[in-house]
């Protein structure tokens, strides 16, 4: 390009760079100056969009952008992803909070079942807790093998699909998706219940408060992984420290013979039970109590699923975090269980006050330390739902990349978070929380089944992997995973049998339905891929035939004139069509049309029923039947200056565009005309 631009210059290919040839100071000295577009920079042969390119141009967009940045923070480039990794402390807070926080309610859920046989059955509480911790030890050992075998992320879906096939992998994925939703719902409900323990008036608003917690978690996660870790690390460690102090104080009092009297709940269970512990009924009751207490095992898979989010070396840091998580949970869970049984604490039948609150109140009374323990417990339980917000979007993105979920789930937002998955999880878990009225006891029967099903499948898959690869020490590794598969499989059966009538059967129905949905999505994407794929890149593209262009014209004005001019630029076969509601208006429009110099052939449709869009659609259908060429509908769209002015117009073009959206063999082109108050051009006469 030179300084002199002639009218006969050949059309240039548009570019973000403008090159001008300049004359130097010396004769014959010429150079090229390159003018770069703002908002983009060159890197190699690519244009890289800078943050400036994301800023909206209009005032309303700028206001929205400011609000969004206040809520979610400024956008992060892909290069900043490395800085979003989790250290061991923040990884324990984000990925381990679900498992650690379940120590606050696992004992109570087991005791609620034992209470059906009377408070004398509470002697089985500690043995059940020991059994749960034993299973957890096996699960932690098995999950460490998952981290070792899949250092790039060993979610149950990936492990199972890789070793057992697609269908078992989808079963594991469906189970985990359900488990993540329930993690958010159960943790939030438990957190609100912990608050209502020292503020009973809140019990009537558990659903509303829970929904607020979920919304705050959603916003926190939309801000990105690192900021979520900073937000959530504090409550996790305050909870651990306060519970450690409480346990030490409780053990000291017991060791010195100073056993405190048990605090009374608002509505205690009776001393006499409804069933007996003798015979098969008693054995089934103990199994049900173990099934309820095994809720403490949930969340132990989150670290193995989130290995890629850890700092390097990822496998080592993930393993350390996993072991610390298991030790922390076991210590708090066994300690609270022993104190509750020794002191003689009875759960609250009304679910107003938690067992954690009763034990704390028995030891320290209503003191500042009591509020510290309950406050940190409440916050951690609510924030433990963050495990779901970490796992669900990541799993959904993997499924989306494998074309088993909508592709929107694979896209990262401006803060490097899987925004679509985060919002979807918040909505679904909020609905589940509201449907069960925020009750932890009503939600527990649906819980744990998904995670144990995924555990069993992934551990079975690893056994097959070690047998196939036969690496050094494969027998020991296969033995560990085989033990994990057997133990988690037995727990799964126990939970299903014990909780079947209470709602576990719904999970057995939901998992196949979700798998069927995932397969249907995959089938659609596969069919679409087969239809769109270009098999040979060296084939020439066929020259398209000019289409039939139909221009609906409501009134003869500048917007219509611009649409017709565009239509004539893409095809010689242009037909305007006008729908009139009476013969008089039809004749008036035809008279104006014949006086207009830019006219094209016109058809007028009289619609005595005053309907505009259906006659146009039938007209387009009839034209399509008579001609094999594709049809292009060019719509004149009037765009007002302000948003409120948009409400003053009928938006017929928008309704017609929506009606034509799924019509085959039809191209819809929108030609917008922006109205400017400062310049009112002359209209066609």
Which residues does each PLM region occupy?
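Extracellular/periplasmic helix-exit of transmembrane alpha-helices
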Residues: 251-261, 322-357
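Membrane-interface loop-to-helix entry segments
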Residues: 217, 222-256, 321-325, 444-456, ...
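Cytosolic C-terminal regulatory domains/tails of membrane transporters and channels
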Residues: 1-81, 527-685
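Loop-to-transmembrane helix boundary motifs in multi-pass membrane proteins
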Residues: 166, 204-211, 309-331, 400-434, ...
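Helix-loop-helix junctions that connect adjacent transmembrane segments
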Residues: 237, 244-296, 498, 502, ...
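C-terminal membrane-solvent junction of multi-pass transporters and transport-like membrane proteins
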Residues: 266, 408-419, 455-492, 497-500, ...
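Extracellular loop-to-transmembrane helix junctions
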Residues: 111-161, 167-170, 186-214, 326-330, ...
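Hydrophobic alpha-helical segments and their helix-loop junctions in multi-pass secondary transporters
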Residues: 240-270, 337-344, 456-471, 520-529
């Amino acid at each position: 390009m030179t300084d002199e631009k002639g009218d006969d210059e050949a059309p240039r290919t548009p570019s973000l760079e403008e090159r001008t040839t300049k004359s130097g100071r010396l004769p014959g000295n010429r150079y090229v100056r390159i003018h770069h577009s703002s908002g983009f920079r060159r890197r190699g042969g690519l244009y890289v969009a800078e943050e400036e390119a994301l800023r909206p141009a209009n005032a309303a967009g700028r206001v929205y952008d400011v609000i969004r940045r206040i809520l979610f923070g400024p956008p992060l480039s892909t290069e900043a992803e490395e800085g979003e990794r989790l250290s061991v402390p923040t990884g324990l807070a984000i990925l381990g909070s679900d498992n650690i926080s379940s120590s606050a309610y696992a004992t109570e859920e087991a005791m609620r079942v034992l209470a059906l046989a009377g408070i004398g059955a509470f002697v089985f509480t500690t043995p059940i807790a020991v059994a749960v911790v034993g299973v957890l030890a096996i699960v932690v050992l098995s999950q460490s093998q998952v981290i070792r075998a899949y250092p790039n992320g060993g979610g149950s879906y990936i492990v199972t699909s890789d070793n057992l096939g697609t269908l078992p992998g989808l079963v594991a994925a469906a189970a985990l998706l359900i488990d993540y939703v329930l993690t958010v719902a159960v943790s939030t409900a438990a957190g609100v219940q912990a608050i209502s323990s020292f503020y009973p008036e809140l019990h009537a608003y558990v659903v509303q408060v829970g929904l607020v917690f979920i919304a705050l978690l959603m916003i926190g996660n939309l801000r990105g992984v690192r900021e979520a870790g900073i937000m959530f690390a504090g409550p996790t460690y305050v909870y651990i420290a306060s519970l450690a102090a409480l346990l030490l104080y409780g053990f000291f009092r017991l060791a010195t013979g100073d056993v405190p009297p048990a605090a009374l709940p608002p509505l205690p269970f009776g001393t006499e039970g409804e069933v007996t512990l003798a015979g098969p009924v008693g054995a089934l009751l103990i199994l049900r109590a173990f099934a309820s207490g095994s809720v403490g095992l949930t969340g132990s898979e989150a670290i193995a699923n989130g290995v890629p989010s850890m700092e390097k070396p990822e496998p080592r840091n993930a393993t350390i975090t996993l072991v610390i998580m298991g030790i922390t949970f076991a210590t708090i869970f066994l300690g609270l269980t022993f104190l509750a049984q020794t002191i003689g604490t009875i759960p609250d039948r009304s679910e107003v006050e938690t067992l954690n609150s009763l034990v704390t109140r028995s030891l320290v009374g209503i003191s500042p330390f009591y509020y510290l323990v309950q406050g940190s417990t409440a916050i951690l339980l609510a924030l433990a739902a963050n495990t779901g917000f970490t796992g669900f979007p990541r799993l959904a993105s993997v499924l989306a990349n494998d074309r088993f979920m909508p592709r929107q789930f694979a896209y990262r937002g401006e803060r490097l978070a899987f925004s679509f998955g985060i919002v979807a999880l918040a909505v679904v878990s909020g609905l589940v929380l509201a449907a069960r009225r925020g009750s932890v006891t009503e939600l527990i029967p649906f819980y744990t089944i998904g995670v144990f099903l995924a555990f069993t499948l992934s551990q079975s898959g690893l056994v097959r992997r070690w047998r196939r690869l036969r690496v050094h020490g494969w027998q020991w590794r296969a033995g560990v995973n085989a033990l994990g598969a057997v133990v988690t499989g037995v727990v799964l059966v126990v939970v299903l049998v014990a909780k079947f009538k209470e709602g576990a059967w719904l999970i057995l129905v939901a998992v196949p339905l979700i798998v069927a949905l995932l397969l249907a999505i995959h089938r659609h994407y596969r069919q679409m891929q087969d239809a769109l794929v270009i098999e040979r890149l060296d084939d020439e593209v066929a020259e398209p035939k000019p289409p039939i262009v139909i221009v609906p014209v409501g009134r003869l004005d500048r917007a219509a004139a611009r649409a017709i001019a565009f239509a004539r630029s893409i095809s010689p076969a242009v037909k305007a069509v006008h729908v009139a509601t009476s013969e008089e208006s039809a004749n008036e429009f035809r008279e104006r049309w014949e006086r207009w110099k830019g006219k094209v052939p016109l058809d007028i449709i009289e619609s005595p029923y005053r309907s505009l869009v259906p006659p146009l659609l039938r007209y387009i259908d009839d034209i399509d039947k008579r001609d094999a060429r594709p049809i292009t509908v060019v719509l004149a769209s009037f765009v007002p200056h302000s948003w409120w002015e948009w409400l003053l117009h009928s938006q017929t073009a928008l309704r017609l565009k929506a009606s034509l959206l799924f019509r085959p063999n039809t191209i819809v082109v929108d030609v917008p005309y922006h109205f400017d108050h400062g310049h009112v051009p002359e209209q066609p006469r």
